[in-house]
Amino acid sequence: MKKILLIALFTFCGIHNTSAQEGAFNLTVNIAGLNSDKGTLMVAIYNKEESFLKKQFKGNVVAINNQKSIAVFKDLPKGEYAVSFVHDENDNKKMDTNLFGIPKEDYGCSNNARGFMGPPKYNDAKFQLTGNKTIVIKI
């Protein structure tokens, strides 16, 4: 009887652990074409249209080398996401804009989404994460 209980326990733990691992994925974001290696890159992930470019789901600040950068987000649940970044050249932790609100620093979004007379739209930047994934954003 003890043997049967132990087998059942180990089987349950194995199934439970496997399903937890199947639902957590890594997202690698490669960004290229930056103007310089100065400052840092602020990379944000969004998982809801209403929070896009307002409140990030997860964020990361990464270094820049040879006008490129890589940000890795681990253990993300399966779902719909969008990514944005700002090249914070002066490291003041915000996107600098001119008098008209036009960005002075590099920025971009997943799917290389661009806005017309305003910021990019979530629907243009969104993608599905159903496994480990690498996306490339070019300036």
Predicted regions and their residues:
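A short, amphipathic beta-strand motif
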Residues: F25-G33
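Short proline/glycine- and polar residue-rich coil/turn motifs
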Residues: V62-Q67, L129
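Extracellular beta-sheet/turn segments enriched in Thr/Pro/Gly and aliphatic residues
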Residues: E105-I139
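A glycine-anchored, Pro-Gly-centered beta-turn/N-cap motif
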Residues: Q67, V72, P77-E80
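Bacterial Sec-dependent N-terminal signal peptides
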Residues: M1-A24
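A short tyrosine-centered beta-strand micro-motif
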Residues: Y81-F85
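Acidic, glycine-anchored loop motifs typical of Ca2+
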Residues: E89-M95
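Short, ordered, surface-exposed loop/turn motifs in non-cytosolic proteins
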Residues: S36-S51
